[in-house]
Each structure stands twice: as structure tokens, then as C-alpha cells.
Regions:
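A residue-level marker of the well-folded mature domains of exported/periplasmic proteins
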Residues: 12, 18-302
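C-terminal motif of bacterial Sec signal peptides marking the signal peptidase cleavage site
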Residues: 3-7
Length: 302
């Protein structure tokens, strides 16, 4: 078989890491606050909350403190992808454990600096956080500084590592495996003209791993079926992980030139690709969470 690749920018491969050690929920058994702090929703065992959509985006204790904090990655909180999926997990745990919680978005938005991220973590601690969940590998420098300063606070680094600090738990993923399965499934389902558009401008290790796995999975399926597969891939328009007219135009162009399905790998970028797919009667592969609820163009999510 022959696998054709058409590149539109991007570089910097990264090696996948294994999932980190202890989960952040170990803080729950050590609480000594007054009972008033347990007045978060769903404290009754028989009324467990199972949908994050049923929970408010923040819940405070009677003294105005928040025990669990979530510091967002770049992009929107409600990105229907990485940020939202992570925060939904935080909310579900907190609500069912009777803990107060709050989210923090670093100042600067898509242009947030390490100082902006540190300031968000510092504010979370000042507001009473005992556990701070930080999403995205870009949090590394700020988290290292905050964890060394606030040694009594536990930090959870999603898409990161423990950095040799006792109060940091790293949680990493093998994105290449999800990407591989998505590429393999797409080709086995009959798609032979694929696209991949990744967030982070080629510097995001997680998106890189998704992309490499996607190509390898498509290659393996093509060998099984004895078919030729062509793949367009691009890191353009995805540096901020945001939806954009430019990305939608690029995706529409790919579809018009024969691409059948595009793996939209990067937060709100999905919205642009899905809009193009809908207009061109084409297909999309989602990422991070099940995005089939967002568009009937989605054939699977990785």
C-alpha cells in the first residue's frame, strides 16, 4: 500500500508518558473543616449526581471558601473538549463528595503567560483550595512555582508530570493509542482520504501524539485492506485551539478537494471543522470527549 502525506506545517514529536500516581481524591479523607463546608450539592448517597450538566459551575462553602479549584488550559471553559471534559470530572467528584469548588481562567486568554497561570493558582489557594487541578502541559512552569510555594496544597497536573514534588500528582495519557484507533477505524470503514488538523501550532505534545497515532493507524488499516490512503495534515490556525473562520475555510477547501473525514484535534477547533463538514456533507473525528452529541457529522471521537 501507499500512504500519502500532505503537510501544512508543524514539528516537534514527543514521547508519551505513563499515567501518574495517586489520584487527587485522597485529600477528601483528611478534611477537618466545620460541617458547614459539606453543604455542597448531592451529599446524599442515594441521590448521586451523574451528569455534570446538572451541576452549577461553582459551589462555595458557608464561609465563602472553595476546597477544590480548576485552572483552565488555553481556550474556552465550555470548549466541549479538553477543558470542559476535565472540569466536568472535577464538578462530578466535588458534588458527590460534598466539596465546594470553583474554576479559574488565567488572565490573558489565549495569550496567557506563566505569570498569569501562577496568579490563577495563587488566587485559588488564597480562596481556600486544598486541591488545585491544572489542565494542559503549558501549566508546567507556573505549577512548579506554585507547588513549591504552597506546600500544604495538593496540585493535579493534567497532561503533565509530578516534577519530583511530593504535593503534585501528574496525569498523562497515551494519546497516540486513541489516534491510532481512530485512523484504523476510519480506513476500515471505507474512508481513504483523511485529514488531520492539530492544536498548538505543532508544539503541543499531546496533539502531536494524537496525530502520529492517527497516521500509523490509517497506515495499518490500509495495509490490511490493500488500499491507498491519502492524508492532509496541518498545524495552521490551531495555535490558540480556538474556532476561527480561517480554519473553517481550510477545512472546507480540503473537503471540496476530496477529503472525506478530518480529525479535528484541539479544543474549540472542532466547531470550525464540524461547520465545514456540515456544509460539505462530510465527516469529522472528534477528540477528548464524545463529540457526537455536538454534530451529526461526527463518526467517532478519539
Amino acid at each position: 500500500m501507499v500512504l500519502g502525506l500532505c503537510a501544512c506545517g508543524g514539528n516537534n514529536a514527543a514521547t508519551a508518558t505513563t499515567a501518574a500516581t495517586e489520584a487527587p481524591v485522597t485529600e477528601a479523607s483528611a478534611e477537618t473543616e466545620a460541617p458547614a463546608e459539606t453543604e455542597a450539592p448531592a451529599t446524599e448517597a442515594s441521590a448521586a449526581v451523574t451528569s455534570a450538566d446538572d451541576i452549577a459551575d461553582e459551589m462555595t462553602s458557608s464561609d465563602g471558601k472553595y476546597e477544590i479549584a480548576f485552572v483552565t488550559d488555553v481556550g474556552q471553559l465550555k470548549d466541549k473538549s479538553f477543558n470542559q471534559g476535565t472540569f466536568d470530572g472535577v464538578k462530578l467528584y466535588a458534588a458527590n463528595a460534598g466539596k465546594s469548588y470553583k474554576y479559574y481562567q488565567p488572565a490573558g486568554g489565549d495569550q496567557a503567560t506563566d505569570d498569569d497561570r501562577y496568579d490563577a493558582m495563587k488566587l485559588a489557594v488564597e480562596n481556600g483550595a486544598k486541591v488545585v487541578v491544572c489542565a494542559g502541559f503549558m501549566q508546567g512552569n507556573a505549577l512548579d512555582k506554585a507547588a513549591k510555594e504552597f506546600t500544604d496544597t495538593r496540585f493535579v497536573f493534567i497532561d503533565g508530570w509530578a516534577m519530583g514534588l511530593n504535593n503534585v500528582a501528574g496525569i498523562a495519557f497515551q494519546e497516540e493509542q486513541c489516534g491510532y484507533l481512530a485512523g484504523y477505524a476510519a480506513v476500515m470503514d471505507g474512508y481513504t482520504k483523511l485529514g488531520f488538523t492539530g492544536g498548538g501550532g505543532g508544539a503541543n505534545a499531546a496533539c502531536n501524539r494524537y496525530g502520529y497515532g492517527f497516521v500509523q493507524g490509517a497506515d495499518a488499516a490500509a495495509a490490511v485492506k490493500g488500499v491507498k490512503v491519502d492524508i492532509n495534515y496541518s498545524w495552521l490556525y490551531g495555535a490558540s485551539f480556538q474556532a476561527s473562520n480561517e480554519l473553517q475555510t481550510m477545512a472546507a477547501g480540503w473537503y471540496q478537494n476530496g477529503t472525506e473525514v478530518i480529525f479535528a484535534c484541539g479544543g474549540s477547533m472542532f466547531q470550525s471543522v464540524a461547520a465545514a463538514a456540515s456544509a460539505e456533507d462530510a465527516s469529522v473525528i472528534g477528540v477528548d470527549v464524545d463529540q457526537s452529541f455536538e454534530s451529526d457529522t461526527v463518526i467517532t471521537s478519539a
